[in-house]
Amino acid sequence: MNYKVVEKFVSINGEGLKSGQLSVFIRFAGCNLNCNYCDTKWANEKDVKYTLMTEKEILSYIKETGVKNVTLTGGEPLLQDGIVELLNLLSLDSTLRVEIETNGSVSLENFLNFKNAPSFTMDYKLPDSSMENFMKTSNFKFLNKKDVIKFVVSSLKDLKKAMDIITEFNLSKKTNIYISPVFGRISPETIVDFMKDNKLNDVTLQIQIHKIIWNPNKRGV
């Protein structure tokens, strides 16, 4: 199987449970959503340049880096043709810790039964993204404490909706919850004040540290 890879690189993980740790990133082309704040829209364009790589070539590249954390991202990695075959191959290497960044619109059910199963960082798209109608709340039951559900917020309206979802589905008992500001649209201070005012326990404010270290628009970091 060939996969459309638009980027592959080693950097620190800018967010999530492994924030600040080295990771090897594999970014795939194409996404089924069109979030208005997306910082990788270029990877979803029809004419984006990509390299076709087999699962064995991807694994070989990962092993050559010597990095154990692996982040599959996009685009939407779970929509890649043959992604189960790639995940199965990666799962056979017990030294690798595979994380999948997924947008919340694809069912996770078919991606759980691996010996060395990947972890998920799953978005829940909020109203300001204009993509909330595509969210699959049925995915919540598949998440556990090695996973993350991420709420990317642009406004107080988004924060209130995130709080409603966290409460309705009792998410803090199931998985890790991160709230991340859309860069340049809402201040971290506003989020902290909201968390304090609403007693949001077991919720983590996440700042994308790669956008602090490098230019926010820089690729390959």
Swiss-Prot record:
Cofactor(s) for this UniProt protein: [4Fe-4S] cluster; S-adenosyl-L-methionine; Mg(2+)
Pathway connected to this protein: Purine metabolism; 7-cyano-7-deazaguanine biosynthesis
Chain positions recorded as substrate binding sites: I12, N13, G14, R27, T73
Main EC class the enzyme belongs to: lyase
UniProt keyword list: 4Fe-4S, Iron, Iron-sulfur, Lyase, Magnesium, Metal-binding, Queuosine biosynthesis, S-adenosyl-L-methionine
Catalytic activity entry: 6-carboxy-5,6,7,8-tetrahydropterin + H(+) = 7-carboxy-7-deazaguanine + NH4(+)
Domain Radical SAM core span(s) in chain numbering: 18-216
Gene Ontology biological process: queuosine biosynthetic process
InterPro entries on file: 7-CO-7-deazaGua_synth_put_Clo, 7-CO-7-deazaguanine_synth-like, Aldolase_TIM, rSAM
Residues reported to bind S-adenosyl-L-methionine: G75
Molecular function per GO: 4 iron, 4 sulfur cluster binding; carbon-nitrogen lyase activity; magnesium ion binding; S-adenosyl-L-methionine binding
Binding annotation for Mg(2+): T40
Residues that bind [4Fe-4S] cluster: C31, C35, C38
Enzyme Commission no: 4.3.99.3
Cofactor comment: Binds 1 [4Fe-4S] cluster. The cluster is coordinated with 3 cysteines and an exchangeable S-adenosyl-L-methionine.
Complex and partners: Homodimer.
Job description of the protein: Catalyzes the complex heterocyclic radical-mediated conversion of 6-carboxy-5,6,7,8-tetrahydropterin (CPH4) to 7-carboxy-7-deazaguanine (CDG), a step common to the biosynthetic pathways of all 7-deazapurine-containing compounds.
Similarity section: Belongs to the radical SAM superfamily. 7-carboxy-7-deazaguanine synthase family.
Name under which the protein is recorded: 7-carboxy-7-deazaguanine synthase
Encoding gene (name): queE
